[in-house]
Amino acid sequence: IDPGLCNVGVAVIDVAGRWPDVAYSLVDARVFSTKPEHGKRGGTMCADDARRVGYLYSSLRGVISAYKPDLIGLEETSGSRSARSGAAMARGHTLALCAVLSATTKRAIEISVAAAKEAATGAQGAGKDLVRDLVIARVNGVAFTDALRGVANTKREHAFDAAMAVARRDIARVLLAERAR
């Protein structure tokens, strides 16, 4: 899950095979989007934020309940450009964490953006294009194109970010080892 208050990326990926021959299959990818109805309000919480949080929370719960994943990776928040955007990021992360914790008793891990990028691409500062290319190469890219049909290119990056965490080989190794027990 790539959390946020404007865009939340979700990728459900099946990890199969035996180490080191790991296969990744896209099950579902979505981007849930909201925007304020009344413009910027100086960083205060209002009824409009409650509407947005409620929509994103129920959307995440729905995906988690539908697929019942063995492991949920939740991207940690990273630096923000302003106090307002930092507050929005914190709200988005908190709502995603609450949705995960209330919908499942399975394992959930928080993944730092820098660590995920370094493990997946070899570079902590990997750009959006490199992340997208890695995910398409490792997970069936055609399926991503189909799943995200109608989603603006600028918003697709959130689904790719969510997939990046699961498409890491170290995460796959842990999942496969646990299933073998």
What are these regions (language model features)?
Residues 1-181:
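Phosphate- and other anionic-substrate recognition elements at nucleic-acid/protein interfaces
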